[in-house]
Amino acid sequence: MASLKKRAKEFETPYPVTKAITKGDAVTKLSMFVMGLGNLAHKQIVKGILFLAVEIAYLLFMIEGGINNLYHLITLGGRAQEEVWNEAKGIYEYTGGDMTILFLLYGVATIFITVLFFMIWRVNMKSAYEVECRAKEGKHINTIKEDLEALVDKRLHWTLLTLPILGIVIFTILPLVFMICMAFTSYSKVGDHLTIFHWVGLKNFSTVLGMGNSIGKTFWSVLGWTLIWAVLATFLNYILGMILAIVINRKTTRIKGFWRFCFMLSATIPQFVSLLLMRTMLKDNGLINNLLVQAGLISSPLPFLTNATWARATVVIINLWVGIPFTMMQVTGILQNIPGELYEAARVDGAGPVTIFFKITLPYMLFVTTPYLITTFTGNINNFNVIYLLTAGAPVPVGATAGKTDLLVTWLYKLTVDLQYFNVGAVVGILTFVILAVVSLITYRNTGSYKNEEGFQ
């Protein structure tokens, strides 16, 4: 708690909004309602006009459509498209109905615009209180030229970060909030709610997390396989890649560059190409089964992609072929940076190769690569390419929404793109994020990389 208070003090400003409201003069307090008034009163004309222009623009936006957007965000509309007979033309015509998805989008966007306005309003209050205090103390009040010069000097970070942050808000945070809102609606092909839908509260979460329906049972089944897949894909790649790197890195190994080149060949081929090619080769009538049959090793094709157990084993093995070269190269770089003095001291003390590995090499590797392991684990939970391109989630039981090799991310794709269960898909997306965030944060905070940031000991 003390550390949090200390960090909070670092962000304190000498001109907070609370003091501007409680201790400011009449002009500063009026700036709450007429933005820029405090700046105008102290001859910061351009700055005051800009604040006032922002307020006028926001008020016009709210009058023209913002208030209506917020109202429709609550109601989500309800007027469906109607079929009306046109006597003159002798045909049926359709009257325009409500597009609920647009009401939801515009409502969320209006909230974001309102939050942005409130942030600018806070800057306005701080600025008004600052110029008031500086005027009372007889200090210099900046001109617009000095403020602009500060944007490329003392406040350069504002200039550089404004556009990236704005881009993140518009293209990342806004769609995420929109998706989260969708999870609380009936937006789905079920019941013909693709055009007109309404708020349903936590019903979708109950559907996904409950065991009394097909969606709920599928979720827990897919979640279990996703976690098993992530653990196997992460640690098998890591362990085998490390062993391969250690073997190649030994002093007795010759032509090391050649062996590294051979193992990196699979990484140079685009995954899209190699996985689709492997999928074709592993089919019942594919190259591998044909070769095995012709060699007399099997009498019937092996169900690489049609049997649940075989398919799961296949994707894990193929993922090793794809992922081990990357791990090998990462580990190779780290191995070459382990201080040689540690090994020399261990040998002097009589330690053998196994002891050196478990006492020096492995602890050092884990210390350096734990963040990489966590990132790889989360990446494997969201590993869309390997699963979808290799098996497309197959085999799929009759009537099921997910196959035996589907991960949460591939199931989410099917729910939204193929089945148009957008509300359920949004819930799955939220739950996936929560699982990843909790596992990653708890794991990282309990690692040596976090607790001993000063270095390996």
Listing of model-derived features with the role each one plays in the protein:
Residues 65-73, 125, 156-457:
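A structural signal for multi-pass alpha-helical bundles of membrane permease subunits
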Residues 72, 76, 90-93, 140, ...:
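Helix-loop-helix
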Residues 25, 82-86, 98, 142, ...:
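Acidic-enriched, low-complexity/disordered segments with a strong bias for Aspartate over Glutamate
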Residues 6-9, 86, 293:
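Polar/charged alpha-helical tracts
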Residues 81-112, 210-224, 303-308, 418:
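Membrane-interface segments at the starts/ends of alpha-helical transmembrane spans
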Residues 35, 80, 138, 296-299, ...:
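Glycine-centered secondary-structure boundary/capping sites
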Residues 2-15, 21, 25-26, 33-41, ...:
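N-terminal signal-anchor/first transmembrane alpha helix
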Residues 43, 54, 65-81, 112:
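Transmembrane-helix bundle segments that line or gate the permeation/cavity pathway
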